[in-house]
Amino acid sequence: VLYSGFDLTAPNTSVSMTINGPAPTILAMFMNTAIDQNLDKFKEENKREPTDDEAAKIKAWVLENVRGTVQADILKEDQGQNTCIFSTEFSLKVMGDIQQYFVHNNVKNFYSVSISGYHIAEAGANPISQLAFTLSNGFTFVEAYLARGMHIDDFAPNLSFFFSYGMDPEYTVIGRVARRIWAVAMKNRYGANERSQKLKFHSQTSGRSLHAQEISFNDI
């Protein structure tokens, strides 16, 4: 019902979900909805049920084409929000399960995690600490996925980042610095290809920076 009227596999449709602990369940529901949409489309166009082979091909096509992002960053849940549902170890395992499913089903256009510094900054971190914690979390996911036997170039393009931007001067370069550190580490430490070296991020204004009065900027 929620996505009625939306073609979830259209090239111009991308769904971003800010969900973390329940991410595996919500993501599974979303993927099944996208698959069901296309199965229903087949039935409407062909006036019959698809065969098992046709249904399998439809599912594979959907997973290869669906676009979006699921936040699913359990590490910042612990560091910045204190809203952990499961232990860190179990959560990393489940996140690894998601990424392994993406690899096995060629899910290339969906970000399996949005590694989030925003919430860490809102909890009190300055720009430098935000960047340090966020990249550290990113490398933690990389090491966890590599330990499960996944190849760096099979999963690194599915990783995205989320940074806070405020009034501190360091925010003017946080994106460039993050991209530089990530690219160098991906290339030199992990032997990743050019696509995997690209750090893709979203940013938005820091909520805690929006003060009605701030002496540092209003004393002139």
Kindly give the residue locations of the regions a language model identified.
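Catalytic core of soluble alpha/beta enzymes
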Residues: 185
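Conserved active-site neighborhood of enzyme catalytic/cofactor-binding cores
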Residues: 220
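Extended amphipathic alpha-helical segments with heptad-repeat/coiled-coil character used for oligomerization
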Residues: 213-214
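Conserved, mostly hydrophobic/aromatic
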Residues: 182
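Catalytic alpha/beta active-site cores
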Residues: 1-174, 189, 196-204
